[in-house]
Amino acid sequence: MIRVTVAGAAGRMGREVCRAALEDPEVVLAGGVVEPGSPEVGADLGELCGAGRAGVAASEEPPPEAGVLVEFTTPEATVEHLSYGLPAVIGTTGLSEEQRAKVEEAARGVPIVLAPNMSVGVNLLLGVVRRLSEALGPGYDIEIVEAHHRGKRDAPSGTALLMGRAAASGRGRRLEEVAVYGREGVSPRGEGEIGIHALRGGAVVGEHRVIFYGLGEEVEVVHRALSRRTFAEGALRAARFAAAAQPGLYSMQDVLSSSP
């Protein structure tokens, strides 16, 4: 049994995590943090997420026995919440290098799982992308296309960047050396480039495609999230890991490799 507190409890992902926690017999939803002054302060978390009354109220701060903080907020809020000193699962995307450094510093004192995508399927596919990139070699051009709902703020997605890094590492390169974000103008494709493209529209939960273009064939790896529930369940899996881990910064790869 673990205790979790959800930061960003009134948001899309926060509500989904609250609901998943309330439906999981091995998880206690200890609390939910919402923005100071929000109309959701004091709201019942179960009613907020559509699961029925839970007897746990949303608040501006974590409760005394918060357990693991599950964080799906903004980069600014995520950094601010590090001051709680709680074990954490961070699914917030769009962190700057400076903000990530602050997360790394906080992880010296508490276990933190930092994962732009909590989906088990996506994280298993990263290894597939790396192996394909290595095995197919430089004769295959790599393009990554991701699509999300119109409200997503950061582009490209953190998951697209993870896939780009996996593809680049399969060829012994760093993504920063070979990435091209979108295309325009008049010029041929550069040798070894990895193109990354972002689409935004409608209510798309999340789609990622990695395409290896050869001269005589194409190989495509696709992941489609059909609902946010997959991310919520992955976050709770990461929370179980964080509850038992030593201080340090971890990824979903660490979570999956430790799970039976």
UniProtKB/Swiss-Prot annotation:
Q: Which PROSITE patterns match?
A: DAPB
Catalytic activity as recorded in UniProt: (S)-2,3,4,5-tetrahydrodipicolinate + NAD(+) + H2O = (2S,4S)-4-hydroxy-2,3,4,5-tetrahydrodipicolinate + NADH + H(+); (S)-2,3,4,5-tetrahydrodipicolinate + NADP(+) + H2O = (2S,4S)-4-hydroxy-2,3,4,5-tetrahydrodipicolinate + NADPH + H(+)
Q: Does the keyword NADP apply?
A: yes
State its Enzyme Commission number(s).
Answer: 1.17.1.8
Q: Which Gene3D superfamilies match?
A: Dihydrodipicolinate Reductase, domain 2 (3.30.360.10), NAD(P)-binding Rossmann-like Domain (3.40.50.720)
| Any one of the GO BP annotations | diaminopimelate biosynthetic process
| A Pfam family hit | DapB_N
Which pathway does the protein contribute to?
Amino-acid biosynthesis; L-lysine biosynthesis via DAP pathway; (S)-tetrahydrodipicolinate from L-aspartate: step 4/4
| Entries under InterPro entries matching the protein | DapB_C, DapB_N, DapB_N_CS, DHDPR_bac, NAD(P)-bd_dom_sf
Active site residues according to the UniProt entry = H148, K152
Record keywords, A-Z: Amino-acid biosynthesis, Cytoplasm, Diaminopimelate biosynthesis, Lysine biosynthesis, NAD, NADP, Oxidoreductase
Q: What molecular function does GO assign, one term? A: 4-hydroxy-tetrahydrodipicolinate reductase
Which parts of the sequence bind NAD(+)? G8, A9, A10, G11, R12, M13, E35, G91, T92, T93, A115, P116, N117, M118
Instruction: Using the UniProt record, name the top-level EC class of this enzyme in a single word.
Output: oxidoreductase
Q: Which GO terms describe its cellular component?
A: cytoplasm
SUPFAM superfamilies from the UniProt entry: Glyceraldehyde-3-phosphate dehydrogenase-like, C-terminal domain, NAD(P)-binding Rossmann-fold domains
Note whether Oxidoreductase occurs among the keywords: yes
Residues holding (S)-2,3,4,5-tetrahydrodipicolinate:
H149, G158, T159
Localization: Cytoplasm
Q: Fetch the PANTHER family from UniProt.
A: 4-HYDROXY-TETRAHYDRODIPICOLINATE REDUCTASE 1, CHLOROPLASTIC-RELATED, DIHYDRODIPICOLINATE REDUCTASE
Entry function: Catalyzes the conversion of 4-hydroxy-tetrahydrodipicolinate (HTPA) to tetrahydrodipicolinate.
- Name the NCBIfam families for this protein: dapB
Tell me which family the UniProt entry assigns to this protein: Belongs to the DapB family.
Name this polypeptide is given: 4-hydroxy-tetrahydrodipicolinate reductase
The organism is: Rubrobacter xylanophilus (strain DSM 9941 / JCM 11954 / NBRC 16129 / PRD-1)
